């Protein structure tokens, strides 16, 4: 009964169209309020109006969109079940014989009422890249060098609305494809990449990309690998996606922002790109191999502090780039207190000055850490309208859209059917550690035949169910009676043994 009341309240609050009502809505970036002592100090963002930050303003006639990944093939009734905060039914692609590319497993579940809809999105595609044919500038008969395909998986964890996550799930792989078009022939050529490409198509007499600028003619020259070209293409694609969101955020209602975790399989290698707090791990013969790391105010403290130090105008008169063990009080002026700045991993003492009474740029610990008392992730896409509560200070300058990309060479190992790459949004990792995921991998896959492609969907479902928990009087609980995840949870399980059946 309590869950039904919570769901009804969340529905009523989230459906409001005015900005004043949205500022109290639960579907906003996680925020913390300054301590009570802030009332005695220069104004800080959390002391102006309420504890939450306002979501991007909407007009009353703005429709609230709700969609799920197309590969789930949900009927209208299925969409309603997927949107039910009370039942929280796990969703997976139907077992109709047409499975996801590479026999990928997928499962998701909606949150327990923190936002009106599931703000996670997912994408799984096989993408063909055709050469621009402007590299060599000569016409050739069709050949295998004219293009290649890559496998693509993406998880997008939205916040302050699902618009950014939905847009990224539809378009990011297209940006990656565009960035790879110039590299089709280069990546299939065993010679080192050329230093320069021709500025205009139609370079006569050139039959190979390696002949455009001979590496031997430039000495010394940095060695550039094919891997680094793919990494650069993915990084550029993220930036272009973010720029597109900035341009179209009004006309296309690109609300909020999203963390992005993407995997590209190309020419024998997995490229895992992460911007946000979603994570990926490989479980190989019982061994756990992290393939990403979280980007939070804690993990990126020094980058944030350096930017605040170099551009103090971004902090206004409200924030300090320095970090203290706790909020500095006016009575402590002139005393020496522990602090650290952008260059420090340890702590030292400094004399407290008036500027130190400002609210810290990075505050809180663990999952409660925030940038400018507002948002708990430091990389991702979107958030172009995000500002400090009751302030004109934008937060976007401190948020990076560039991912960290890690490369895993599948050809270097013999993989068995139980070796998998697990991708999960933070709804999974908030309550499940790497060892528990690995144990679930072993437990679930051992009950299926190695050639049964449904085993990976079953594993994804088990991981989601394990993080969600079961409903009890005091909410969703794990078997140890600890709180289950109340967040949206999305999981991909990718077998490392090779491509499976794909959609026709």
Curated annotation (Swiss-Prot):
Membrane-crossing segments per the record: none
CDD domains per the UniProt record, alphabetical: PP2Cc
GO biological process, any: signal transduction
Molecular function via GO: [pyruvate dehydrogenase (acetyl-transferring)]-phosphatase activity; protein serine/threonine phosphatase activity
Residue ranges constituting the PPM-type phosphatase domain according to the UniProt record: 103-496
Biased composition (Low complexity): 14-23, 197-217
SUPFAM superfamilies the record matches: PP2C-like (SSF81606)
Keyword field: Hydrolase, Phosphoprotein, Protein phosphatase
E.C. designation(s): 3.1.3.16
Cytoplasm keyword on record: no
Pfam families, A to Z: PP2C
Region feature (Disordered): 1-102, 194-217
Phosphothreonine, modified sites: 41
Record's GO cellular component terms: mitochondrion
In-chain residues carrying the UniProt-annotated modification Phosphoserine: 65, 75
Listed Polar residues bias regions: 59-73
Assembly and oligomerization: Interacts with UBE2I/UBC9.
Name of the protein in its database record: Protein phosphatase 1J
